[in-house]
Amino acid sequence: MQDKLNQIKELALVEIKKAKDSTTIDTIRVKYLGKKGELTTILRGMGSLSKEERPIVGKLANEVREVLEAELEAVTKAVKEAEKQEKLKNEVIDISMPGKKQTIGKKHPLEQTLDEMKKIFVSMGFAIEDGPEVEKDYYNFEALNIPKNHPARSEQDTFYINDNIVLRTQTSPVQARVMEKQQPPIKMISPGKVFRSDAVDATHSPIFYQMEGLVIDKDITFADLKGTLELFAKKMFGDKVKTKFRPHHFPFTEPSAEMDATCFVCNGKGCKVCKGEGWIEILGCGMVHPQVLRNCGIDPEVYSGFAFGFGVDRMVMLKYGIDDIRLLYESDMRFLNQF
């Protein structure tokens, strides 16, 4: 058996010295030192040896193992270094090559328009309020005078998380939350993302931006609403812009109206953007419904107020003559670099 061990040692050393890559070295290691390797097999057969032979063979076997492991380690180190140098040789970096130009970002047109609108309202004394996008059904509907089974709910295809939790369909819930925790006077705007289960096309998106406003105090009238929104329109679109109000219906305001402005592309003469009418619908508005005030803990006999709401995406599309809302969400730098 001692001769067999010496023979294994000599054969293994020859193979190790011939090894030129890591794969060959691993194969040799398994062949001689693995669980089913030749040296391991001999060690398992030591039980058949006499008591006198066992210590001699055991000592020799351990010596052979140590020699082979040391040689394998040395060759492995040399081979890995050679492989590293070969890899570096084949992956030479040409430092004279021009670098890749980094794309420089800029403010998205939606963000630009939001900032402009917020700046105008803040200059008029409005505070900016925020609220959850995942909202309770109560704040999104019932607090705003839209009870269950109200026909207005069918107009808003809603994403329901469960029976009582929705993705907000408007930023009006922020107003309800503010009225609950704060007594008048209240003067606020609530910009943010809203969600509706609309099929995506040129004018509809399941995610878009709104900005809604609310003013509550004693003796607030429709004249205050008109004055506020007309001033906003002049600051947003220029002093020459004209506005008009048309009667409308919203469940959370009474009376309700929609405000139109003279087309800022053709100055009211009629064009493709305004469909030849000279006017563009800008927003919905109205006096806060007394029931909404009651729902939020405010006495409608003492206080009154007005509310309004913009579709920010629509404002951007109208302002820049964009005819497809999908362009605002595709992150195409060829489009965004125009703003």
Swiss-Prot record:
Family annotation (Pfam families): Phe_tRNA-synt_N, tRNA-synt_2d
Subunit and partners: Tetramer of two alpha and two beta subunits.
GO cellular component, one term: cytoplasm
Record EC number: 6.1.1.20
Protein species of origin: Clostridium perfringens (strain SM101 / Type A)
Annotated signal sequence range: none
Protein name: Phenylalanine--tRNA ligase alpha subunit
Domain of life where this protein originates: Bacteria
